[in-house]
Amino acid sequence: GGRQAYFLGVNGMCDTTVLQRIVAILQKQDGGHNRIEDIRDYIMRKVSFVQAMLCNDTDNLIHNVMCGPVAILVDGFSAAILLDVRRYPTRGMEQPDMEMVSRGARDGFVEMLLTNANSIRRRIRNPRLTFELHKVGSESITDVAICYVEGLAQESVIEETRKKITQMKVSALTMGSKTLEEMLIKKSWFHPLPTIRVTERPDVACSYLQEGYILVLADNSPAV
């Protein structure tokens, strides 16, 4: 429609190939879109493999862009369109060096929370398997997920874990899951038995889920 548009994103965190396809499609559009909602709907029709949503808040826009999605700012509109074209650099799912086995699965958790969650769900295809996503760290805004099987895990333990995570007052999880672990089990007295177990193996984590345990996953950390 002759309007200028600006793309706002972080280099290295988005899929440039997909982004170039979107730009080519938008350049071919025939105009007639007088509302930002019309442009969003046009993108969702023509580029069905990308999730598009509107964003009216500046702080929310900045947070989303820093997480990987790309924002489209169209001249004349007060809202922005967020396109989920994230692609984070990651390594393959290798067997953890400290938990090597001669038989069984050879994969291990990686530094991406979404990949780790999918690895768990691939093993436990139960609709009662639940992931609760939280944000921790005023500066890092790290994704932290509580994972459990509804009906197996104790509600009191789930609620206590949820409360501790939501009440954490830190600027960043500098040591990833290690920092999270220390804040979750912080006590003023010594416990003779371990109350927490750390693993980098999806099969071990899933076996604990089936026994009613709760998993806490942090983005940027392969340890659960």
Q: Across the structure, where does each feature detected by a protein language model lie?
A:
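Membrane-embedded alpha-helical signal segments
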Residues: 1-224
